[in-house]
């Protein structure tokens, strides 16, 4: 829960009918007119395999870059077919004030956006992926978290400033030939990434979303307010066991060799 009016995020949804991928993509661009400042565009579609996923993700990035130029929002492509068939686009806009300064940056060939005012900084990352075509889910997760770490270090923001995290995982409940479940491998990579941070205000609010293709992809919102003008609180559900308190009995697959046991999903229900 964020108790500050000027960090509002507005969500907008658009959908096309069925057509060629290029036609649907241009239809989405024609439908969208920004009201505030877009910081993230997420496109949901149905590629047939990872090769097509990578090709289409590149097309999406190029079209959005042409549309927005140097002020392009961050971009994600989720391989999950909308119903009915077509493309769906979700846009996140931020409501800026006169005190806010927005910057469009790139590190390790990854575009990201910061919104900063005196004493407070926000960070938006989207579409952070690894080697979708060749690497294992675990290797991809490690690479994605390494990229996130590089950006957060460059921006002087602690890992604990992540407030919202979308985790997209290909065939999330599948196991590989060694018995490692995709989701458990991701959770172990996340636990190792989080272990250096102090989570005094709880873990990020997050969701693990299974996809048909696309390996591991992460979107992140981070918020770091040194002036304490923004209060961030974890929201729990007393009717549920917190995900980070799950027992070993509900965790599937083999444990990581770097760990003594399988690690729990590190997230809060909301924040």
Describe the residue ranges of each PLM region.
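N-terminal presequence-like segments and the immediate start of the first folded domain
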Residues: 1-166, 171-271
């Amino acid at each position: 829960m964020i108790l500050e009016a000027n960090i509002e995020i507005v969500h907008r949804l658009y959908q096309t009918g069925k057509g060629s991928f290029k036609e649907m993509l241009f239809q989405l661009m024609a439908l969208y007119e920004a009201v505030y400042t877009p910081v993230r565009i997420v496109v949901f579609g149905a590629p047939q395999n990872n090769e097509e996923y990578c090709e289409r993700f590149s097309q999406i990035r190029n079209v959005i870059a042409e549309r927005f130029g140097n002020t392009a929002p961050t971009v994600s492509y989720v391989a999950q077919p909308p119903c009915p068939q077509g493309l769906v686009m979700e846009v996140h806009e931020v409501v800026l004030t006169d005190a806010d300064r927005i910057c469009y940056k790139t590190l390790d060939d990854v575009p990201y956006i910061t919104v900063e005012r005196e004493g407070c900084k926000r960070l938006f990352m989207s579409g952070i992926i690894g080697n979708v075509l060749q690497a294992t889910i675990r290797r991809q997760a490690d690479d994605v978290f390494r990229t996130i770490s590089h950006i957060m270090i460059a921006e002087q923001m602690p890992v604990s400033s992540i407030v919202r995290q979308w985790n997209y995982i290909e065939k999330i409940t599948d196991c590989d030939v060694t018995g490692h479940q995709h989701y458990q491998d991701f959770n172990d990579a996340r636990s190792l990434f989080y272990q250096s941070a102090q989570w005094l205000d709880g873990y990020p609010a997050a969701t693990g979303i299974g996809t048909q293709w696309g390996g591991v992809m992460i979107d992140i919102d981070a918020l770091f307010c040194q002036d304490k003008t923004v209060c961030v609180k974890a929201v729990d559900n007393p009717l549920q066991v917190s995900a980070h308190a799950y027992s070993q009995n509900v965790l599937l697959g083999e444990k990581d060799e770097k760990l003594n046991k399988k690690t729990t999903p590190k997230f809060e229900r909301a924040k």
